Amino acid sequence: MAEARRLPPPLPPRLDWFVHTQADLLAQSGIPEWFHGTISREAAENMLESQPLGTFLIRVSHSHVGYTLSYKAQTCCRHFMVKLSEDGTCAFAGDHMTHASLHALVTFHQQKPIRPFGELLTQACGQEDPANVDYEDLFLYSNALVQDAESQILRTEVQRSSCPPEEASERKPSTTTKGEFASASCSPKALFEDSGQKLWKNLRSLPQTSQRVKQRLTSHLLAMNLLGDARQVAQQHHSPVTRAFSWDSTSHSEDSCAATTSLQNPAEPQALRGREATFRDSRPASWRKAFSGVKAWRGKVVRALSAQEPVDFPEAQGWLPEEYLPPPPFAPGY
């Protein structure tokens, strides 16, 4: 607060450019005699009125970022706007000739006349009261800003040197805290990079995923082919197989009846066994061959289906490539 109170009243915003960019340049080799700070146009004319022709001064402009050159002409005082460019050069408004500094501009027009009037600059107009210069407020504020910045730097260095090592270690945040802050303040760019890395991993895993899906589809197609072969065999021997199945059902029904009878009459099982053997022997050889072929194909189908992994269609859908899934929320136009 003490340093803030020592600062002079702040300058108008239109003069900030001079304090921050021009004050040090003008003061490097001494403030020139022709510089007069922020005096008004009327004050400049009053100072030049009693001076000889060609007497000039340069003042800080109130209307633009730059200066104003005022000099004594034959019948009046003339005023020229001096524009400053971003690279530090200066020139009269509307003139194509640029100069490296105000000193260079003044030196040039002391030798070359100012167009279109053809008048030369002759001598500089000094201060009316050298003990009370009119640019004091500009450089006072600039010096105060420099001193305030230096005192803040010095104060920071003193605090760092006087801080004990224990307190410094306590004040030093841990790596986990830094990680938490970093994760909490994650920017959209970081999120986009993470999403891009995930997408790249999914793209790299596409060959393995497609290979797994291909293997499952191949196994299921093999099982379907076995079923189709079994149906073809059944169609080739349709009539005998049907009759054999009907005979088997008849024999099964007879066997069940025989079992019921045997429970009621235990003396008949031997007769039933003999009748069943006679019935099997009376079957045609072609029927027995067809029936055994169907049973063989049925065993192959059962073994093929039992050897394959169970199908889990939701899981297979989960292995689909990324371009077939709904777009993520950060996708353009989503």
Curated annotation (Swiss-Prot):
May be phosphorylated by FES and ACK1. One of its GO terms (biological process) is signal transduction. It is found in: Cytoplasm; Mitochondrion. Residues 34-125 form the SH2 domain. One of its GO terms (cellular component) is cytosol. Its main location: cytoplasm. InterPro entries: HSH2D_SH2, SH2, SH2_dom_sf. Residues 157-181, 254-280 are annotated as: Disordered. Signal peptide: none annotated. Transmembrane segments: none annotated. Keywords: Cytoplasm, Mitochondrion, Phosphoprotein, SH2 domain. GO terms for molecular function: protein-macromolecule adaptor activity. Interacts with FES and TNK2. PANTHER family: HEMATOPOIETIC SH2 DOMAIN-CONTAINING PROTEIN, T CELL-SPECIFIC ADAPTER PROTEIN TSAD. Adapter protein involved in tyrosine kinase and CD28 signaling. May be a modulator of the apoptotic response through its ability to affect mitochondrial stability. This is Hematopoietic SH2 domain-containing protein. It comes from Mus musculus (Mouse).
